[in-house]
Every structure is written in structure tokens, then in C-alpha cells.
């Protein structure tokens, strides 16, 4: 069973990280091509392209300038511990055991606009380049054109290594679009998280993102090996609703009190 998640815009390159046997990102040749494109853009260009403040644009221009193809523990950190958005709050990597992290290295992948696909212990340098960015490049008008079939093939290789042909899609639509689902040989499960607010169950973005991380954590800590086990997910008050679910979309509901 393989789970895929999105990266995060919020990064942490300051706090201490446990000593794990790190791995190298696989697609740095591709990353280098994107960096070269980004280095030609001014902070003003980046601000407009990414819809970010001048301050953030300046920071990311500096990051692109400093990025190097050589990744080591002086200029990089493992991806699982570098991302700090809502999904990663739910995943809470810092509290995972060493065995959990080693399991995750085989069963979890992070999609990335710059790196394509990352294993949890792959080293990465700080960057901001969302998959939906309309960055013109030698291969087309955006990052979907740039990555083409590369990410899909890498995901398939990771699925093949599992031996059960199951992919759990916990990524956002923006990032999952980089995976060409019709080219995958896999049973694909998409968990959906609904919260009851004002008497109606619906997707509430903040809660749904955190729940995706919680599902990753559950899959890792319980060493899940088959689809039926996913239905037992019960963290943070969620429960599986069989009546609302299909063979490929697993619906989890929760009642929240505000």
C-alpha cells in the first residue's frame, strides 16, 4: 500500500531533526532545469506569478539563487521533517518512531512542484514552487507539461514495490493532477473527510487537510497492508460511513462542536 500527499508552503529548516539515514532526491536533473528558469525571474515576476507578497518573493528569489544540485545535511533536510502545513500537523512526523519513519520511507511519497516525487527521507532544500504554478518552461506552459509522465512512472514504480497494487490518494487535486491516473496499474482509493457543521456534512478545508495527515499517520503506525483496514481509521473522532462510500472513494465523517 502506497500513500501520496501534497507538500506544504510552510517550511521548517530550523528545529532539530533526529538522525535518520537520509536518501537523495531522484529527479535533481529536472529540478535544476526548473531552478534555471526561476533564476531568470525577478522578485517582482515571482510575486506576480505566485501571487505572493514582495517579502516572500524576495525570500524565494534568494532560495532559487542559493539552490544547488548537491544535497547534504548542511544545506538540506529530510522532506518529511521540512514541510509544516496542515497535512503535516496531522501527520506529526516528529513524534513518529524510527521504525515508523523507516516504514514510511517505503509506503509514503510526497508530490512536489520542484522535486517531482519525494520519499520521506529524501533531502530537500527550501523552496516554494506549487504544482499549479503557470511557469513557462522548455517543455510547456506549466509544471504539468514539464513533468509529463515522469511523476506517474515514479509513482507506478513505488506501487509495484509494494506488491499489492494499492494507491491511497491523500493529495490535493492540484498536486494529484500531476499523476496520470489512467496510466496507473493500481487500485486507487481516495479518502474524503466530511465534518458536520450546521447540520450538514461537508469538506472543510482546514480539517480535511489535517485529516489527510492523520490518515497517513494511521497507515504508517498500524502498518496497513490491505484496503479494508483503511475503513477502521478513527483518529480525531472520524468514522467510516459505508452508506456514503464507493469502492474507490472512502467517506469518513465527524461531528464537531464549535
UniProtKB/Swiss-Prot annotation:
A single Gene Ontology CC term: cytosol
GO biological process, any: response to hydroperoxide
Listed Pfam families: H2O2_YaaD (PF03883)
PANTHER family (UniProt xref): PEROXIDE STRESS RESISTANCE PROTEIN YAAA (PTHR30283:SF4), PEROXIDE STRESS RESPONSE PROTEIN YAAA (PTHR30283)
Family under the similarity heading: Belongs to the UPF0246 family.
Protein name: UPF0246 protein CGSHiGG_08495
Amino acid at each position: 500500500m502506497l500513500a501520496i500527499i501534497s507538500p506544504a508552503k510552510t517550511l521548517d529548516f530550523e528545529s532539530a531533526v533526529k538522525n535518520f539515514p537520509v536518501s537523495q532526491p531522484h529527479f535533481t536533473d529536472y529540478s535544476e532545469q526548473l531552478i534555471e528558469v526561476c533564476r531568470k525571474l525577478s522578485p517582482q515576476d515571482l510575486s506576480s506569478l505566485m501571487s505572493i507578497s514582495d517579502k516572500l518573493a524576495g525570500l524565494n528569489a534568494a532560495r532559487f539563487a542559493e539552490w544547488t544540485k548537491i544535497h547534504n545535511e548542511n544545506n538540506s533536510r529530510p522532506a518529511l521533517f521540512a514541510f509544516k502545513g496542515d497535512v503535516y500537523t496531522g501527520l506529526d512526523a516528529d513524534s513518529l518512531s524510527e521504525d515508523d519513519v523507516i516504514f514510511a520511507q517505503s509506503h509514503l511519497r510526497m508530490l512536489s512542484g520542484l522535486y517531482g516525487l519525494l520519499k520521506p527521507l529524501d533531502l530537500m532544500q527550501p523552496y516554494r514552487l506549487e504544482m499549479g504554478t503557470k511557469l513557462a518552461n522548455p517543455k510547456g506552459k506549466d509544471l504539468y507539461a514539464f513533468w509529463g509522465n515522469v511523476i506517474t512512472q515514479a509513482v507506478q514504480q513505488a506501487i509495484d514495490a509494494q506488491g499489492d497494487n494499492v494507491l491511497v490518494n491523500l493529495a490535493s487535486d492540484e498536486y494529484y493532477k500531476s499523476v496520470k491516473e489512467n496510466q496507473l496499474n493500481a487500485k486507487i482509493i481516495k479518502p474524503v473527510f466530511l465534518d458536520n457543521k450546521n447540520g450538514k456534512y461537508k469538506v472543510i478545508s482546514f480539517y480535511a487537510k489535517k485529516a489527510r495527515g492523520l490518515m497517513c499517520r494511521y497507515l504508517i503506525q498500524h502498518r496497513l497492508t490491505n484496503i479494508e483496514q483503511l475503513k477502521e481509521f478513527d483518529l480525531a473522532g472520524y468514522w467510516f460511513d459505508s452508506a456514503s462510500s464507493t469502492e474507490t472513494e472512502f467517506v469518513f465523517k465527524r461531528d464537531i462542536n464549535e
